[in-house]
Amino acid sequence: VGEGGTAAPCAAIAAARQGTRTALIHARPVLGGNASSEIRIHISGADQSLKQTDYAEGGLVYEMMLDNKACNDDFCYSIWDSVLFEKAKAEKNLTVFFNTVMYDVETDGDRISAIYCFQETTEMRYRFTAPLFADCTGNGTLGYFAGAEYRQGSEAKSEFGEPTAPEEANNDRMGNTI
């Protein structure tokens, strides 16, 4: 699983819970991406406007939020970092590689077969192979390295039927997670 924003621990934990030996590779020293103590943008997600009362986060995000609420009522971001770390550490099939930058991929046809990484704190180089990789970078970094098509900006409401999407596609980008 590439990177450590909110989506990455969810993907990695889900894979590990299904019995898959999983590596979570993150360039930073804490999980959470923009929602970590490094950036401090809260997870707004499905209820981002606080007006969409029919929408809420579920699954692992909700599980993490409940764990956080139990020990972090004032929402201290450093404690949130610890909640995410402990959640990942609790999974026996999951290994987290902090301070590890992905810099290249190998492909076999149209599939990624390996990724190359450098761990800055140990100066170790890694080559990870797997039948499946999850690009949770937020920027599509693995896909970009592999030559995948990509787009930037917001899609029009008509493209995917999202009720809160703009009427017309645009180049706007979000500054927060989920």
Give the role of each language-model region:
Residues A14, T20-R21, H26-R111, R151, ...:
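Conserved N-terminal/central alpha/beta ligand/cofactor-binding core
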Residues A114-Q119:
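Short beta-strand segments that buttress and anchor functional surface loops
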Residues A12, G33-R40, R127-F128, G140-E149, ...:
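Short, solvent-exposed loop/turn and secondary-structure capping segments
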Residues V1-A23:
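N-terminal Rossmann-like FAD-binding beta1-loop-alpha1 element of flavoenzymes
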Residues G2, H26-A27, F98, T129-A130, ...:
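A secondary-structure boundary/capping signal
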Residues T122-L132:
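Core beta-strand elements of the Rossmann-like FAD/NAD(P) dinucleotide-binding domain
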Residues D135-I178:
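Glycine-rich loop(s) and the adjacent beta-strand/alpha-helix scaffold that form part
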Residues A8, W80, L84, G138-L142:
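Stable alpha-helical elements in mature extracytoplasmic
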